[in-house]
Structures are given as structure tokens and as C-alpha cells.
């Protein structure tokens, strides 16, 4: 798999790093670790929203060399918290994120996959927290999907499962898996270790802005590594063919 993004000694104040790593096309990479580990800070830096020490190469070019317009064509970023910028119909908000605004069937398909069919005519300021989260997710998918944007390469998601129920999480997993199979690189933060153990290809385990471990999910999410990160004991079980992590008291 080709390298989409290369990080070298990336650091930001006292909150992050220095850390190094790479993001590959066609993979799902999870950032895991306790609150305050630096996951959101790292994602914002990878998205080009902040600057600091170290270097980031995106598609072979320094990240800071990308214009905002060009960057929006090649990467999409979902921040952890955002309120509706102003009131508008959901369908209009989603259309604003499409590079090809004639692809109404694609908009309907993505909205349907996230159970937003009956929300398209509603105003963004009349949505519940979970509905708004799904609208935001649909927007970044429409922005970056190779189906309508051949230049799309990278999707960055900060705790995308927030406010989603089990069925909605499963729907999002299917969408992300399909994007990954189309060659997109996906980086997302998560607090659900078992979700990471099941769905991530690789993981970076962070604590206090430092990377404790990186590699394949099975190699990173080990009881010793997790005990170091969270200060508590874990066991890894095999249940009906699925690996599962549990904490022990």
C-alpha cells in the first residue's frame, strides 16, 4: 500500500509529540488512548488546521504547501465538536460539501445509508445531537468519496461514533469499509477498544502526547500496552471467534 501521509517528529507545545508515523492508502488507522492523550490535537495537525514542530508530507508534498482549496479536494476532516454554522436545509448543507453537485443520487444514497432520508428537508438547527452528527458524517463522505471525487485520498475523523446508536455505528462501519476498499486512507480516533480490535487495520496507542505503540491492531492492543496507557489491567479473550478486551479489577 502506498504512503499517503508521512509524519516526522511532529510536536505541538506540551500536548503532542514528538512522534512519527505513516498513513497508507486503503487502510483504516485508529488513534486510541485515554482522554488527554493527544488524539484530537494530532488529527487537527494532520488535517492542516494547526501548525507546530516537525514535518508532515501529504501525497509527497509538505502539508503547509497545500492551499485550503486544494486540500479540501484531497482530504476531508470531521472535528470532534461543531454546531451548525447557520440554519439551512440538510440537503443544502450536504450539497455544499459535494465537488460534483449534480450527483444527487449519490447524496440520496449516503443519506439513506445513515438513515437521514426523512431529515433532508429539515433545518440543521432543528436536529438532535445524533442527527447532526450523522449529517456531518454524510457531508465529509460526500466531500471525499472516490465515486464523485477521484482526487480524494484521506479521511480524518475525530470520534465519529459519538452520539450514534449501535445500528448507526454499524452503518458507518460499512461506509468506511467501502471507502477503504476504494483506496481511501482513513484515520479516526476511538474510545472503544473492542471496535478498534475488530475494525482497524492498524492502531496508534497514545498517552500524554506520546506514542506508546504502533502497528497492527493485535500487536498494539495487548494487555501490557493497555495497562501502561490506562493504568489498569486488561485481559484479551476469544469469544465465538472474536477477540475481545475486558478490564479486570
Curated annotation (Swiss-Prot):
EC id: 7.6.2.8
An annotated GO cellular component: plasma membrane
Keywords attached to this entry: ATP-binding, Cell inner membrane, Cell membrane, Membrane, Nucleotide-binding, Translocase, Transport
Domain of life of the native organism: Bacteria
Main subcellular localisation: membrane
Domain ABC transporter: 1-233
Binding positions for ATP per the UniProt entry: 33-40
CDD domains: ABC_Iron-Siderophores_B12_Hemin
HAMAP family tied to this protein: BtuD (MF_01005)
Name the UniProt record assigns to this protein: Vitamin B12 import ATP-binding protein BtuD
Gene that specifies this protein: btuD
